[in-house]
């Protein structure tokens, strides 16, 4: 096995992580700005994924993974939101959550439902890390707890 073969899985995983982060950002943008899915996907693919924008270099991301998450969340939102709502504490409504947290939970829930080929632990860990990139307080713990509850309900398994 060559060195190049050893590096390929890590690169793919890293590109999926970058795609997840970009998907959360795109979903946030859609939520706040009312941007449509086709417009936001085209913008990210042309100007953000692996590109430099306003002095920031965006990580190279798996574009098909990005598209799958963004379009899947939009397509399945009426199924995702009730699941997320049922996993929140009784006195919390999804609408009370920060838009970024909503985007993270929707993307994570979509992957738990749709990407059975990806272990729950990977999905939950990736989205908790994304939450840490945006928040220093309790939001990452909330993301962990909610996605873990959803995984138990949907797949019968939790993050190990």
From Swiss-Prot:
Keywords: RNA-binding, Transcription, Transcription antitermination, Transcription regulation. This is Transcription antitermination protein NusB. Belongs to the NusB family. InterPro entries: NusB-like_sf, NusB_fam, NusB_RsmB_TIM44. Gene3D superfamilies: NusB-like. The gene is nusB. The keyword Manganese does not apply. Involved in transcription antitermination. Required for transcription of ribosomal RNA (rRNA) genes. Binds specifically to the boxA antiterminator sequence of the ribosomal RNA (rrn) operons.
């Amino acid at each position: 096995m060559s060195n190049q073969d050893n590096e390929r899985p890590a690169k793919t995983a890293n590109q999926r992580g970058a795609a997840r982060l970009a998907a959360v950002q795109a979903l946030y943008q859609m939520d706040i700005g009312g941007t449509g899915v086709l417009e936001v996907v085209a913008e990210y693919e042309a100007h953000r994924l692996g590109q430099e924008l306003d002095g920031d270099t965006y990580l190279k991301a798996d574009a098909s993974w990005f598209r799958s998450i963004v379009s899947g969340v939009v397509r399945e939102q009426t199924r995702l939101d009730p699941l997320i709502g049922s996993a929140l504490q009784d006195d919390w409504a999804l609408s009370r959550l920060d838009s970024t947290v909503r985007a993270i939970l929707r993307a994570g829930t979509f992957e738990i439902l749709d990407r059975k080929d990806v272990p729950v632990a990977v999905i939950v860990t990736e989205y908790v890390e994304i939450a840490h990139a945006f928040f220093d307080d309790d939001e990452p713990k909330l993301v962990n707890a909610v996605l873990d509850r959803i995984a138990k309900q949907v797949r019968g398994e939790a993050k190990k």
